[in-house]
Amino acid sequence: MADKDMKWKTLSQKYLIEKPWLTARVDKVELPTGAIIDEYYVLEYPDWVNTIAITKDGMFVFVRQYRYAIGKTVNELCAGVTEKGEDPMAAAKRELMEETGFGGGNWQKWMTISANPSTHTNLTHCYLATDVERMDVQHLDQAEDIEVRLFSRDEVMDMLEKGEIWQSLMAAPLWKYFAKVK
């Protein structure tokens, strides 16, 4: 049996805010059933990237920074935003170098996920970089206050199990890593 077409039809779009880091719009849509949703809110973002970076001696490279929206200082994978027209892997390598000073190594696409496919237009491209090494100092933006932290495999697993990796887009590739790489 063939899958039925569940695609919605866009009847209209109205932009509410257009900023470099966030664009919000309200769409009027028609469902395959004929039902109309007059106000369906959509958030447009550039694609995001994050990297599980592991040094030659098996240490995981994390960043520690304050996250205003949740009011917490947290440990995270190195992550960032793709620039317009930028290849996601190039963006991930750039972000790792800028935020941590680490680079080089062996890179592979790990997974692609969505923060919220019902309201967000962007994807998060996750990478695994092994055998990275410190190659430079951090080159932070004016608004960034980031500490580089190195954790062992056991420490990262412990943070995951305790719910201390707050960002779900970072927890997912880490859980995949621990499920696949013994």
Residues covered by each model-derived region:
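Conserved Nudix-box catalytic region and its N-terminal flanking loop in Nudix hydrolases
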Residues: D3-K7, Y40-Y45, N50-R94, L140-Q142
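Short, well-ordered beta-strand micro-motif
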Residues: V26-E30, A53, L128-T130, L150-S152, ...
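Acidic, metal-coordinating catalytic segment for phosphate/diphosphate chemistry
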Residues: K14-N50, K56
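Active-site-adjacent beta-strand/loop module that shapes the phosphate/pyrophosphate-binding cleft
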Residues: R25-T33, N116-M135
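Extreme N-terminal tail/first-helix region
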Residues: M1-K19
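A contiguous pocket-lining binding segment that forms or flanks enzyme active sites
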Residues: E86-L128
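Nudix hydrolase/Nudix homology domain
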Residues: A2-W8, A35, T73, K84, ...
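Hydrophobic residues on conserved beta-strands that form the core of alpha/beta folds
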Residues: T10, A24-V26, I37-E39, V63, ...
